[in-house]
Swiss-Prot record:
Any Gene Ontology CC annotation: extracellular region
GO molecular function list: calcium channel regulator activity; potassium channel regulator activity; toxin activity
Residue ranges occupied by any SCP domain in the UniProt entry: 41-169
Tissue: Expressed by the venom gland.
Species annotation: Heloderma horridum horridum (Mexican beaded lizard)
Name assigned to this protein: Cysteine-rich venom protein helothermine
Entry similarity comment: Belongs to the CRISP family.
Physiological role: Alters a variety of ion channel activities, including voltage-gated potassium channels (Kv), voltage-gated calcium channels (L-, N-, and P-type) (Cav) and ryanodine receptors (RyR). Is toxic to mice (causes lethargy, partial paralysis of rear limbs and lowering of body temperature).
């Protein structure tokens, strides 16, 4: 039997069906601690081997809250991305990768497929060919995404792709202003020498900036200005990765 797989940034609209249990799913359900470990370790191992090397790549950790949100997305069986509002968790907009298949695949396989888009990606340039996808790769290696949660659903009413795997990443990557520079080039942990775990930084800034120009605003008006209430990362995180 030919196994079909599809991993898209923008999926074609298909008939909706409610996600339900499948006899083949229990081993892949992310309520299982071993699956959480596999998913998190796979992401971190791939983040360690980016080329060129990253000086500010954060280590990812598992979030049950994000996983629950990803499960809600998977259970819809729409085979398309959720809205920005549906991916906003505790005020933080998160990213999302999708993997559709006609038979169940391991999480490591799905994540590796996302990462393998790197063959079409050139740092600070973008896609190296037309009509190729790179957004899954850049999200997997987005330096500031440090929490993730994933989920799988079985969608029996879908004609082809009945297995639907979703990972969500917070904060989300693929920011338009730097989507082709998903991290800073430099020696591993170059930006976090005192908070490093085998090439990955362990000191994420847990504050967020609303504006892209917060560093410039800080220089102009200082953190005491009322407008800077929307620049908490710039003002509060002095040594953390932000």
């Amino acid at each position: 039997m030919i196994l079909l797989s599809l991993y898209l940034c923008l999926a074609a609209m298909l008939h909706q069906s409610e996600g339900e249990a499948s006899p083949k799913l229990p081993g892949l359900m992310t309520s299982n601690p071993d699956q959480q470990t596999e998913i998190t370790d796979k992401h971190n191992n791939l983040r360690r081997i980016v080329e060129p090397t990253a000086s500010n790549m954060l280590k990812m950790t598992w979030s049950n809250k994000i996983a629950q949100n990803a499960q809600r997305s998977a259970n819809q069986c729409t085979l398309e991305h959720t809205s920005k509002e549906e991916r906003t968790i505790d005020g933080v907009e998160c990213g999302e990768n999708l993997f559709f298949s006609s038979a169940p695949y391991t999480w490591s396989y799905a994540i590796q497929n996302w990462f393998d888009e790197r063959k079409y990606f050139r740092f600070n340039y973008g896609p190296t060919a037309q009509n190729v996808m790179i957004g899954h790769y850049t999200q997997v290696v987005w330096y500031r995404s440090y929490e993730l949660g994933c989920a799988i659903a079985y969608c029996p009413d879908q004609p082809t792709y009945k297995y639907y795997q979703v990972c969500q990443y917070c904060p989300g990557g693929n920011i338009r202003s730097r989507k082709y520079t998903p991290y800073s080039i430099g020696p591993p942990c170059g930006d976090c020498p005192d908070a490093c775990d085998n090439g990955l930084c362990t000191n994420p800034c847990k504050q967020n900036d609303v504006y892209n120009n917060c560093p410039d605003l800080k220089k102009q008006v200082g953190c005491g200005h009322p407008i800077m209430k929307d620049c908490m990362a710039t003002c509060k995180c002095l040594t953390e990765i932000k």
